[in-house]
């Protein structure tokens, strides 16, 4: 019989995704057939699954941890925010429409069927399924029709372990408050809790464990320290961009403007791992550094809206001066579209302005269209003469004079554009920098020897390290029962 466990958080960003990945790798290392599952995810960091649809990149990483091919059924409902009030809805890997918050609330009962169908598919033949919740089950205003947390857990009869983040403070109140506010039906699903991101002497929290037990009756299944290896894993949420620090004194400064609807920002993780790169995330209100050698404009879920914001920050003028000084620019997906002369949206797909002038650094224009490209791709960089693998997730078609100088060839077709002076490059291909050969060639073009480290191998090693750290601190009896053959 397939065993199931669900990690739900006392809030967002408590570390559920990493813990699920770590448990998946721990189970896989012990010979179990383990699968990750997340009923509903909200993220603009999407991946193309091995069966050709869109899922959250956290579930893609968890599949890697489980050593199984990724599937659309691992994340049957993916919400991709396009504005403060509306999201694109992806169901079992395919776009199913758009909805605002209240509209989506009405849709949730209909989506439960797809969630349960996917859960059954994932569970078939598995020894263990590790499920990840979303946000917090204590948001009882969202409980009616819920498919992300307790609504799913009660329907699928999956036991729940709560995760509390002690690093942000107030973890006892978060756990006890969650117990107090949950209805009895939901409270019965909780079997215990984990404390995550603990720093220092764990025995200092013994009284805290006793207090939580006194108020809730829940056992503690482990106090997890701050997992250093997790820093080597791709990040899921853009909130981490606020926590990144600069690495001064390195050979190349790479500046990345933080867009309001930034998407697939984990494209940049391999650059952050390079010892000779100072990766700087430029936040609203700050200029693009004048000493940057390279500016990377990442993907966006709202190209026109982010382009308007880009200009409002004065980054367009910063970028022009950067190029005049001899600096280089790479635009990926939405960033590529912004670099052109014009972006139009005649059908109102993005829900905002219908046309806007681009940054004018590439002689191309983009028109948004409803057909969405979603695929894994093998490519050849014409600029650096290396083979690489990546993926495409985009709307719109880009054409113009600079497309006559494509930046890459993807599966024998031209993609992207290169400016006449070679300083500005755009492409729809995500995952460029994950290729060690491409990253090494790029750095070499700046006079830097780099890219020697195998990035994919380093991610895999980090998953092993996270699994080993969890095995050392989790309650042995609970873990043995979870991982029994």
Swiss-Prot record:
UniProt xrefs under InterPro entries: Class_I_gatase-like, CobQ/CobB/MinD/ParA_Nub-bd_dom, CobQ_GATase1, CobQ_N, CobQ_synth, GATase_3, P-loop_NTPase
Q: Name one GO biological process term.
A: cobalamin biosynthetic process
**In the record, what terms sit under GO molecular function?**
ABC-type vitamin B12 transporter activity; catalytic activity
Q: Which UniProt keywords apply?
A: Cobalamin biosynthesis, Glutamine amidotransferase
Q: In which pathway does it act?
A: Cofactor biosynthesis; adenosylcobalamin biosynthesis
Q: Which residues form the active site?
A: 333 (nucleophile), 430
**Partners and quaternary state?**
Homodimer.
The UniProt entry, under HAMAP family, shows: CobQ
Output this protein's name.
Cobyric acid synthase
The scientific name of the source species is: Sinorhizobium sp
């Amino acid at each position: 019989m397939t065993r199931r466990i669900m990690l739900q958080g006392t809030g967002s960003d408590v570390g559920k995704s990493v813990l699920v990945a770590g448990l998946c790798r721990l189970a896989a290392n012990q010979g179990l057939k383990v699968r990750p599952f997340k009923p509903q995810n909200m993220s603009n960091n999407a991946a193309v699954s091995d069966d050709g649809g869109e899922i959250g990149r956290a579930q893609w990483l968890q599949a890697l941890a489980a050593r199984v091919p990724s599937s659309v059924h691992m994340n049957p409902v993916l919400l991709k925010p396009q504005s403060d009030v509306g999201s694109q809805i992806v169901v079992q890997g395919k776009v199913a429409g758009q909805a605002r918050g209240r509209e989506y609330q009405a849709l949730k009962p209909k989506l439960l069927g797809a969630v349960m169908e996917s859960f059954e598919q994932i569970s078939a033949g598995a020894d263990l399924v590790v499920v990840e919740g979303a946000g917090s089950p204590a948001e009882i205003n969202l409980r009616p029709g819920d498919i992300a947390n307790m609504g799913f857990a009660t329907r699928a009869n999956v036991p729940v372990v709560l995760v509390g983040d002690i690093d942000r403070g107030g973890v006892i109140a978060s756990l006890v408050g969650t117990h107090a506010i949950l209805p009895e039906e939901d409270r019965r699903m909780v079997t215990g809790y984990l404390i995550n991101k603990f720093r220092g002497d764990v025995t200092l929290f013994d009284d805290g464990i006793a207090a939580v037990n006194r108020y809730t009756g829940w056992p503690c299944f482990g106090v997890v320290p701050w997992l250093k290896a997790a820093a080597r894993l791709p990040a899921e949420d853009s909130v981490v961009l606020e926590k990144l620090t600069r690495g001064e004194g390195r050979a190349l400064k790479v500046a990345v403007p933080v867009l309001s609807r930034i998407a697939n920002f984990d494209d940049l993780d391999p650059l952050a791992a390079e010892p000779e790169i100072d990766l700087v995330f430029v936040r609203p209100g700050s200029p693009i550094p004048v000493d940057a050698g390279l500016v990377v404009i990442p993907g966006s879920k709202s190209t026109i809206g982010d382009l308007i914001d880009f200009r409002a920050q004065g980054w367009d003028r910063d970028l022009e001066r950067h190029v005049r000084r001899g600096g280089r620019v790479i635009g990926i997906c939405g960033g590529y579209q912004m670099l052109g002369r014009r972006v139009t949206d005649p059908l109102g797909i993005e829900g905002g302005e219908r046309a806007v002038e681009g940054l004018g650094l590439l002689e191309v224009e983009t028109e948004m269209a409803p057909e969405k490209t979603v695929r894994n791709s093998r490519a050849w960089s014409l600029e650096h003469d290396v083979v690489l693998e990546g993926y495409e997730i985009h709307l719109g078609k880009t054409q113009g004079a600079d497309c006559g100088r494509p930046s890459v060839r993807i599966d024998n077709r031209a993609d992207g554009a290169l400016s006449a002076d070679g300083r500005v490059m755009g492409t729809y291909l995500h995952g460029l920098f994950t290729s060690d050969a491409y990253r090494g060639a790029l750095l070499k073009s700046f006079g830097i020897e780099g890219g020697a480290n195998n990035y994919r191998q380093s991610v895999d090693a980090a998953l092993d390290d996270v699994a080993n750290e969890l095995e050392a601190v989790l309650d042995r009896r609970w873990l043995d029962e979870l991982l029994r053959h």
